Amino acid sequence: MSQPKKSLSSLLAPYLTLDPAAERMIGAITTDNRQLDADTLWLAARGVSHHALDYYHGEPAAAIVYEPPYPAPPAGALPCPDLGAHLGDIAANYYDHPARAMTVIGVTGTDGKSSLVHFLAQATGGAMLGTIGYGPLDALEVASHTTPDPLRIQQHLAAWRERGIKTVAMEVSSHALAQHRVAGVDFAIGVFTNLSRDHLDYHRDLEDYFQAKARLFARPLPCAVINIDDAHGRRLLDDNLVHPDTRIIAVSSAGNHHPRAAATVSAGNIALDADGIHFTLQYEDAKRDNHAVSSHSAPVTSHLLARFNVDNLLNTAACLLALDTPFTDIPAILATLHGVPGRAERIRLPNGAAAIVDYAHTPAALVNILQGIRPHVPGKLWCIFGCGGDRDHGKRPLMAQAAENYADVTVITDDNPRTENPADIIADALRGTGKRENIWVKRPREEAIRWVLPQLQAGDAVVIAGKGHEDYQIIGTTKHHYSDQETVRTWLTSP
């Protein structure tokens, strides 16, 4: 994708007033000095522990713009205060604001982001950007981060604009919001799914985590979709943290309403069985011209598993309604949505049991998947999980507590131990258990799965939690190929 050259002054306005003698024509932009050449602008921002200029070794560049202070910047480098916060806007300017040529939906929250952006990409025929990958569903690139850096985001959006893609659903992580990675993205819809303990190795506490998420809704979005069954979702509305010009669609699977919402999407008559999910989709919209309430309802049947997918389907419906999809079309669209890799992904066993592979790696997510799967399981519910190394130690006992409370049998194993001793990680988790009845420790991870599968009887299920779609395991600092799905399927085909 070729991009016409732009003047340095046009890219940096209004953040930096350029001396005419410093004017340059810029053919590319980068934050990586390894990609520099005489045509490229280097945007050298300050990171958490290092400054980008620390890695500079005299590579040629069209110009260098850096974030002050820095003790000895290269000769001719231009200081730009708060450059890190402006990278997204500069990149959007360079690529001619691609988000303005499409509808971009930003999804934030602890759980449900990946499923929702995947469902939206299915429903709209557009692209997705998130943990599972970047791009249209038939050409997904492997994701390096849930939300990539600001330049990569704008590069993706510009490439998809050239392909004629009209809708993009994007996961917006708390890290991305705190680090201004989505600056320069003009969102048409912002979605809040829920919030529970996660990423407290990065955020000071849960309040700091919430405030990072809330940044998305301080923008003047055309529409916000808010889960009001979640206490933090209600707080966004109660504390007026959503921009006053934003139209709010409340979502509830528990019959809740909120006075600030212009419309409500809800579910009634929810039933879960071996075939999937059944509910009545309900939509109430206060018309903006005369404030008359318009109500609609229709039955929905989905082959997806788990109670939490009712919420994912409601969020999908709310976004489609915000995109002016006729209500009468939505039940059929929801019925066609297929499962997301590593999200309540069912692998049927020959004897009538099932293995459910899920990405749940927080205490709340583990509760949700176990509670969500339980109605589909007439027999015994097993749970295999581990906890990531070099991450929030405090959630480890909470994970074990969740498994002990909501599964019949719990097996604690490895996740991504990274540089920690796996036995120490498991010991941390075990502190959250009570009598430790029906709790086993089996490692490594593939051995835990192979130990459980032959014990499952007809009607039983095992939730294999934590890795989901991932096809690797990090041991030390090395990524090794590993997949929960492959482990199950290899066992199925073994003699």
Each PLM stretch: what is its role?
Residues 57-60, 75-76, 219-222, 244-247, ...:
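P-loop/Walker A phosphate-binding loop and immediately adjacent motor/lid segment at beta-alpha junctions
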Residues 358:
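Conserved phosphate/oxyanion-binding catalytic-loop motifs
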Residues 47-49, 174-175, 197-198, 230-231, ...:
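Short glycine-rich anion-binding loops that position phosphate/pyrophosphate groups of nucleotides
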